[in-house]
């Protein structure tokens, strides 16, 4: 179980053991977008609405490093025809943006710090792949895909933390989908 890659299902297991309101109907909606032009999904809700729980649920469902069949037994997603097709079929990269924004030494070069952390772990997880020197994240993903056929499922939690944590850098007002790329470019 890695920090970013294939974290397993323990976090969702802990959630389900408590009083859990079944929100697994999100899974078939995401499944329907796999291998389509609409494969990039953004779940937006107000704060404290359960987005982090949903992210952990998606990690548990897609992560190939664990078996989550029993964890989802009796939940809504299990009834969907696509359930078995995608269950535990991907290497999942989970990124909680607040784990970076909370570290003052990383705030100046946030995107680079995120890439460096993920790249380091990916190279550890796939040591037999040949990588170009000074590879960025896209180069590393491409090298792994071409070397192994491995496909990745990215889950980015607290992506809007960039807008909350850097209000002084917001040049645009409005939707975080518009603001975040501008802040990331700085």
Locate the predicted segments by residue.
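Phosphate-binding site recognition
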Residues: 1-186
């Amino acid at each position: 179980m890695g920090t970013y890659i294939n974290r397993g299902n323990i976090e969702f297991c802990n959630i389900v053991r408590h009083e859990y309101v079944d929100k697994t109907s999100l899974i078939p909606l995401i499944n329907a977008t796999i291998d389509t032009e609409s494969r990039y999904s953004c779940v937006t809700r107000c704060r404290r609405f359960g987005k982090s729980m949903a992210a952990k649920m998606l990690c548990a469902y897609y992560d190939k490093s664990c078996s989550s069949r029993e964890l989802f037994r009796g939940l809504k997603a299990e009834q969907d025809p696509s359930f078995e097709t995608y269950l535990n079929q991907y290497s999942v990269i989970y990124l909680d943006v607040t784990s970076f924004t909370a570290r003052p030494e990383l705030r100046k070069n946030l995107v680079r710090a995120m890439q460096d952390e993920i790249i380091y772990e990916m190279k550890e997880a796939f040591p037999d792949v040949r990588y170009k020197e000074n590879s960025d994240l896209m180069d590393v993903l491409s090298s792994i895909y071409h070397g192994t056929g491995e496909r990745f499922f990215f889950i980015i939690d607290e992506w809007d933390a960039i807008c909350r944590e850097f209000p002084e850098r917001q040049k645009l007002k409005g939707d975080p989908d518009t603001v975040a790329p501008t802040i990331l470019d700085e």
